[in-house]
Swiss-Prot record:
The keyword tRNA processing applies. RNaseP catalyzes the removal of the 5'-leader sequence from pre-tRNA to produce the mature 5'-terminus. It can also cleave other RNA substrates such as 4.5S RNA. The protein component plays an auxiliary but essential role in vivo by binding to the 5'-leader sequence and broadening the substrate specificity of the ribozyme. SUPFAM superfamilies: Ribosomal protein S5 domain 2-like. It catalyses: Endonucleolytic cleavage of RNA, removing 5'-extranucleotides from tRNA precursor. The lineage of its organism: Bacteria, Pseudomonadati, Pseudomonadota, Gammaproteobacteria, Enterobacterales. The keyword Hydrolase applies. Keywords: Endonuclease, Hydrolase, Nuclease, RNA-binding, tRNA processing. It comes from Escherichia coli O6:H1 (strain CFT073 / ATCC 700928 / UPEC). Consists of a catalytic RNA component (M1 or rnpB) and a protein subunit. Its EC number is 3.1.26.5. PROSITE patterns: RIBONUCLEASE_P. This is Ribonuclease P protein component.
Length: 119
């Protein structure tokens, strides 16, 4: 049976882990959200989130975006390649409802799976 937990080892926690992804990322994005990814040697994917107060003013909106993103990652973690992902929220992401945000994330996860497989 597949475990769908979200333990600590599936998260990017330190600034150096985020910097690793920002140095040479593969990008997949929409006007409201971008997911940066970089292959890791751990054998499983990890995720980090950046939702700036400058782009999403209200705390409850930032929390909603982070919660939906974590849930999307948690459900797809076994389909994703062994990469470190950083999800960057841009202006306008707060205007998306839950369904639109979930659909955008699913599309970006699929795109990263294709990018990881190569040409």
């Amino acid at each position: 049976m597949v475990k769908l937990a979200f333990p600590r080892e599936l998260r990017l926690l330190t600034p150096s882990q985020f910097t690793f992804v920002f140095q040479q990322p593969q990008r997949a994005g929409t006007p409201q959200i971008t997911i940066l990814g970089r292959l890791n040697s751990l054998g499983h994917p990890r995720i980090g989130l950046t939702v700036a107060k400058k782009n999403v003013r209200r705390a409850h909106e930032r929390n909603r975006i982070k919660r939906l993103t974590r849930e999307s990652f948690r459900l797809r973690q076994h389909e994703l390649p062994a990469m470190d992902f950083v999800v960057v929220a841009k202006k306008g992401v707060a205007d998306l409802d839950n369904r639109a945000l979930s659909e955008a994330l699913e599309k970006l996860w699929r795109r990263h799976c294709r990018l990881a497989r190569g040409p």
